[in-house]
């Protein structure tokens, strides 16, 4: 894998971390279709990663448990390993990220930053 940009935040005028991270060079994108899951695996080059998700339209189920993401059935609330439209997650190397939508199609973007602890 090419050199990756570690998770690092810009500084504000007082020297504190700003909200936005530096750009990443570990990015994935796809257009997923109704009921067909797509997946990507977190790289193994670092142990911990911050993973950011973007979707259009917002109707994407994401599963990071190792299972394939599924669309929920109508009816009562049930336990699930999938999450609807997570913004970002801290994941470990080798985690499988599975995504599925009930829309005709959904554009997804997955951006990752490795974390180095001192």
Where are these regions (language model features)?
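Noncatalytic modules at the cell exterior or secretory-pathway interfaces
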Residues: 49, 89-108
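Short, intrinsically disordered N-terminal pre-domain segments
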Residues: 1-24, 114-118
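Surface-exposed ligand/attachment interfaces on beta-rich extracellular proteins
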Residues: 22-46, 104
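Gly/Pro-rich, tryptophan- and cysteine-flecked surface segments typical
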Residues: 2, 28-34, 109-111
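Short proline/glycine-enriched turn/loop motifs at strand-loop junctions of beta-rich domains
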Residues: 46-48, 54-59, 103-105
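Beta-sandwich interaction modules
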Residues: 78-94
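Short, surface-exposed beta-strand/strand-loop-strand elements in extracellular ectodomains
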Residues: 54-73
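Edge beta-strands of jelly-roll/beta-sandwich modules across compartments, strongly enriched
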Residues: 62, 104-116
């Amino acid at each position: 894998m090419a050199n990756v940009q570690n998770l690092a935040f810009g500084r504000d005028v007082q020297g504190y971390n700003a909200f936005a991270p530096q750009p990443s060079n570990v990015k994935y994108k796809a257009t997923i279709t109704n009921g067909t899951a797509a997946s990507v695996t977190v790289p193994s080059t670092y142990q911990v990663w911050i993973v950011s998700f973007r979707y259009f339209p917002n109707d994407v189920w994401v599963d990071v448990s190792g299972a394939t993401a599924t669309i929920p059935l109508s009816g009562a609330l049930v336990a699930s390993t999938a999450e609807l439209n997570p913004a970002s997650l801290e994941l470990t190397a080798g985690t499988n990220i599975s995504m599925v939508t009930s829309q005709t199609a959904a554009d997804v973007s997955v951006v990752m930053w490795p974390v180095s602890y001192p």
